[in-house]
A protein has these predicted regions:
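Short polar catalytic/cofactor-binding loops
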Residues: 7-13
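Short hydrophobic-aromatic micro-motifs
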Residues: 37, 139-144, 167-168, 196
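Cys-nucleophile CN-hydrolase/nitrilase-fold catalytic domain and related Cys-dependent amidase chemistry
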Residues: 15, 24-102, 108, 173-186, ...
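CN hydrolase (nitrilase-like) catalytic-core segments centered on the catalytic cysteine
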Residues: 60-80, 149-233
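Short beta->alpha transition motifs characteristic of CBS
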Residues: 45, 52, 97, 109-115, ...
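C-terminal beta-strand edge segments of enzyme domains
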Residues: 108, 132, 200-265
Length: 265
């Protein structure tokens, strides 16, 4: 399975430019003949315009589905369409849509952990469900940016579905970029799966986004790694490596669930 990540520099609040630019990056990425293309978090609006966010949002993913559904079908490529600022039932969500090779939307996910230090929770509604899906017979999960800091979320997904890979779409800032690298490596290692992150780059307000999109193997090794600027990276994923690792160290067999039911008061 070959993966491409389109590390995109979007313009804050300029949705027409961002949709056109996303199409341009997709058409560049398909030249590498990938099985799956991945985009970053809230690429349609940037993260995030505070003055007129509601007026800039997609509505029920219509524009996103039209663009990526058509591109995925035309080129026969699975697409993890990052996430978009999106209105559903009158409320704004940070929503990810996933498309198969036929252009069909096979899954969607609303970000469950909103980033309170940047007041995301004042503008967006939090999601309430986890999402897993199949692409080319491989079980996949998706999380969005701040979700990565909650290992319980990823472990719940992997225990329920034994994921082959986890997609992480993000707008992670430069000043904490080393933490992104560490957390991605940890999630891949502890869950014995591929972790594919597509981060953004560029600047919004006073925040610089740090790039470092990457593909980590189930051994925790970076097999593709981006710099700080806009670029497309690609990696070939060895489909048998997770099984080989599990034969040596089977962390899922050796789990002790009776010890893990910890709830705060």
């Amino acid at each position: 399975m070959k993966i491409c990540c389109a590390q995109m520099n979007m313009r804050l609040g300029d949705t027409d430019y961002n949709f056109n630019h996303a199409k341009e990056l997709f058409e560049k990425a398909v030249k590498a003949e990938p099985d799956t293309i991945v985009f970053p978090e809230t690429w349609n609006t940037g993260f995030f315009p505070r003055d007129n966010l509601y007026g800039l949002c997609d509505i029920d993913g219509k524009r996103t589905k039209e663009l990526f559904g058509a591109l995925a079908k035309l080129h026969g490529v699975n697409t993890v369409a990052g996430s978009v600022s999106n209105i559903k039932k009158g409320k704004i969500y940070n929503t990810s849509y996933i498309f198969n090779r036929h252009g069909e939307c096979v899954a969607e996910y609303d970000k469950t952990h909103l980033f309170t230090p940047m007041n995301e929770n004042d503008f967006y509604e939090k999601g309430s469900c986890l999402t897993s899906f199949e692409l080319d017979g491989k079980m996949c999960g998706i999380i969005i940016c701040y979700d990565l800091r909650f290992p319980e979320l990823t472990r719940t997904l992997t225990v329920k579905n034994r994921l082959d890979c986890l997609f992480v779409v993000s707008q992670w800032p430069d000043k904490r970029i080393s933490q992104l690298d560490t957390l991605l490596k940890a999630r891949a290692t502890e869950n014995q799966m591929y972790v594919i992150c597509c981060n953004s780059c560029g600047k919004a307000y006073n925040t610089v986004f740090g790039g470092h999109s990457a593909v980590y193997s189930p051994l925790g090794e970076a097999i593709a790694f981006a710099g700080e600027n806009e670029e497309i990276i690609s990696a070939e994923c060895d489909e048998g490596i997770s099984a080989r690792i599990a034969n040596e160290i089977n962390v899922f067999r050796d789990r002790r669930e009776e010890l893990y039911d910890v709830k705060s008061n």
